[in-house]
């Protein structure tokens, strides 16, 4: 079920709202329904007939302030998490046998996202240059995660809704320019986004199999590794930074798991792209660039070499 309503007054004031009800068979019948909604508002100041705006409107044909708030949900990636699954191809004592391959999580429900955006849209020189700047904040709760369980159950992990959450914050900037005359046309597009994504609400640290850790207050994708301290010139052994039983910093040739620490993050702080198209007398020249920085790349193969 999807409904949406929008209202505009004199092309200056805008309000909108939407409601959506989704149902998914990836959840048990009691938890299939998700009710999601959003509201938005905008104000185009350049449609006001104020004298002091006249010099501004010679450059900016459009200045629109906007804001929105909404609530939505995420599905698990697998289809049958709420059902216990069996494999009938096994054999036991020369006979056929059933083995349990997946244990049901009947209470599984939607991940929840609360999203807030506020920004401004600018149009310059009859929209030949358009700029959109926006701040966003997204709070995700009831995260669907593989949680370690007692191996007496026959499994090492189970998919569950946890108390953990992720708070994403950042800015987004888009620039779109069209420069043309009788002989040539130049289209330019530039976008940039910043991201801060941190965990909260975790009951304990969760160390993944991919050298990353989930810890309250730390970035999503934080690398949790032994920190390299160089090579011992006498023995050729790899050295690591660590801490002794008294809490003193040491350098050791042991890769003791207790020496592991957060040494970086895999999620870029800034990312974006640049796209340009230049046309002249039937000839086209285009280019596309993407970039990201503020993150660390872990090369597992290189990490095992000395």
Positions of PLM-derived features:
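A signal for specific C-terminal beta-sheet/loop modules enriched in small/flexible residues
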Residues: 19, 99, 134-135, 148, ...
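Flexible glycine/proline-enriched surface loops and loop-helix/loop-strand junctions
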Residues: 100-102, 257, 267-269
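Conserved C-terminal beta-signal and adjacent last beta-strands/turns
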Residues: 174, 187, 265-293
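Conserved small-residue
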Residues: 164, 180-266, 297, 301-306
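A short local loop/turn or secondary-structure capping micro-motif enriched for an aromatic residue
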Residues: 24-25, 140-141, 248-249, 294-296
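Extracellular/periplasmic, surface-exposed regions of secreted and cell-surface proteins
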Residues: 1-223, 281
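C-terminal beta-signal and adjacent terminal beta-strands/loops
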Residues: 57-61, 139-140, 196-198, 277-306
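Short, surface-exposed charged micro-motifs
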Residues: 4, 121, 228, 240, ...
């Amino acid at each position: 079920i999807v409904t949406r309503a929008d209202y505009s007054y004199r092309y200056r004031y805008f309000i909108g709202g939407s409601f959506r009800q989704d149902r998914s068979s990836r959840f048990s019948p009691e938890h299939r329904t998700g009710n999601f909604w959003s509201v938005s508002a905008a104000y185009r100041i350049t449609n006001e007939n104020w004298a002091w705006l006249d010099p501004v409107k010679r450059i900016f044909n459009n200045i629109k302030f906007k804001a929105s708030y909404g609530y939505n949900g995420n599905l698990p990636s697998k289809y049958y998490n709420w059902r216990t699954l069996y494999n009938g191809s096994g054999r036991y004592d020369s006979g056929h046998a059933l083995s349990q391959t997946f244990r049901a999580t009947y209470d599984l429900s939607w991940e929840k996202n609360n999203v807030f955006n506020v920004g401004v849209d600018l149009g310059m020189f009859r929209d030949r240059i358009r700029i959109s700047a926006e701040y966003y904040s997204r709070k995700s709760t009831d995260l669907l995660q593989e949680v370690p369980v007692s191996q007496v159950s026959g499994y090492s992990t189970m998919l569950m809704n946890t108390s953990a959450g992720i708070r994403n914050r950042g800015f987004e900037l888009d620039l779109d320019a069209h420069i043309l005359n009788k002989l040539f046309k130049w289209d330019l597009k530039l976008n940039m986004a910043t991201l801060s994504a941190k965990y909260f609400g975790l009951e304990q640290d969760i160390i993944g199999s991919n050298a990353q850790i989930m810890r309250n207050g730390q970035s999503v994708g934080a690398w949790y590794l032994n920190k390299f301290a160089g090579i011992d010139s006498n023995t050729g052994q790899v050295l690591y930074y660590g801490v002794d039983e008294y809490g003193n910093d040491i350098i050791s040739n042991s890769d003791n798991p207790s020496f592991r620490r957060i040494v970086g993050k895999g999620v870029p702080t800034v990312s974006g792209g640049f796209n340009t198209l230049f046309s002249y007398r039937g000839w086209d020249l285009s280019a596309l660039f993407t970039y990201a920085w503020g993150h660390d790349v872990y090369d597992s193969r290189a990490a095992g070499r000395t």
